[in-house]
UniProtKB/Swiss-Prot annotation:
<dbReference type="InterPro" id="IPR002176">
    <property type="entry name" value="X-over_junc_endoDNase_RuvC"/>
</dbReference>
<dbReference type="GO" id="GO:0006310">
    <property type="term" value="P:DNA recombination"/>
</dbReference>
<feature type="binding site">
    <location>
        <position position="68"/>
    </location>
    <ligand>
        <name>Mg(2+) 2</name>
    </ligand>
</feature>
<keyword id="KW-0963">Cytoplasm</keyword>
<keyword id="KW-0227">DNA damage</keyword>
<feature type="active site">
    <location>
        <position position="7"/>
    </location>
</feature>
<comment type="similarity">
    <text>Belongs to the RuvC family.</text>
</comment>
<protein>
    <recommendedName>
        <fullName>Crossover junction endodeoxyribonuclease RuvC</fullName>
        <ecNumber>3.1.21.10</ecNumber>
    </recommendedName>
</protein>
<feature type="binding site">
    <location>
        <position position="7"/>
    </location>
    <ligand>
        <name>Mg(2+) 1</name>
    </ligand>
</feature>
<dbReference type="InterPro" id="IPR036397">
    <property type="entry name" value="RNaseH_sf"/>
</dbReference>
<keyword id="KW-0540">Nuclease</keyword>
<feature type="binding site">
    <location>
        <position position="141"/>
    </location>
    <ligand>
        <name>Mg(2+) 1</name>
    </ligand>
</feature>
<keyword id="KW-0479">Metal-binding</keyword>
<dbReference type="InterPro" id="IPR020563">
    <property type="entry name" value="X-over_junc_endoDNase_Mg_BS"/>
</dbReference>
<dbReference type="GO" id="GO:0008821">
    <property type="term" value="F:crossover junction DNA endonuclease activity"/>
</dbReference>
<comment type="function">
    <text>The RuvA-RuvB-RuvC complex processes Holliday junction (HJ) DNA during genetic recombination and DNA repair. Endonuclease that resolves HJ intermediates. Cleaves cruciform DNA by making single-stranded nicks across the HJ at symmetrical positions within the homologous arms, yielding a 5'-phosphate and a 3'-hydroxyl group; requires a central core of homology in the junction. The consensus cleavage sequence is 5'-(A/T)TT(C/G)-3'. Cleavage occurs on the 3'-side of the TT dinucleotide at the point of strand exchange.</text>
</comment>
<feature type="active site">
    <location>
        <position position="141"/>
    </location>
</feature>
């Protein structure tokens, strides 16, 4: 299964595509980030995210896309901007004819590290280890996107095993 993870951010929107082979080994197909200039108007940032995510999806052909659930932010303005980014990311996925799976941040950390309250650096280190990468992906949004994809792969594999036993 090939899964794309997206980590929505107002400075960088990270993406990563992870594939699980028939032995349940994970492979990073591509990872990167859409860099957003602080000087650009919001509508230009959103258009750039849309174009670049559509391009990655079309080029690498994931089966499903996973995105983190909305979390509560202290600053309402920041939360609203992230909501815009998340909406555009979901629109790009829908435009490419794929479905979106969403996961709570706690679920992503649990699936990758085994502990829902893991520190960001622990998640990043485990992503590098699980994908056999020479170093932790940068910026952090890229590692987060890969973690979201890994979460979906682990979750769907568990559900498949449960249904097979039923």
């Amino acid at each position: 299964m090939r899964v794309m993870g997206i980590d929505c951010g107002s400075e960088y929107t990270g993406f990563g595509i992870v594939e699980s082979d028939d032995r349940a080994r994970l492979h990073c197909i591509v990872a990167g980030a859409v860099h957003l200039s602080a000087r650009d108007p919001l509508e230009n940032k959103l258009a750039k995210i849309f174009r670049e995510l559509c391009s990655v999806i079309r080029e690498h052909d994931p089966e499903v896309v996973a995105i983190e659930d909305v979390f509560y932010a202290v600053n309402a303005k920041s939360a609203l901007k992230l909501g815009h980014v998340r909406g555009v990311a979901m629109l790009a996925v829908a435009e490419c004819g794929l479905r979106v799976a969403t996961y709570a941040p706690l679920a992503v950390k649990s699936a990758v590290v085994g502990y829902g309250k893991a520190e960001k650096c622990q998640v990043q280190a485990m992503v590098a280890r699980l994908l056999n990468l020479p170093q932790v992906p940068e910026p952090a949004d890229v590692a987060d996107a890969l973690a979201i994809a890994i979460c979906h792969l682990h979750t769907s594999a568990t559900l498949t095993r449960m249904h097979a036993k039923a």
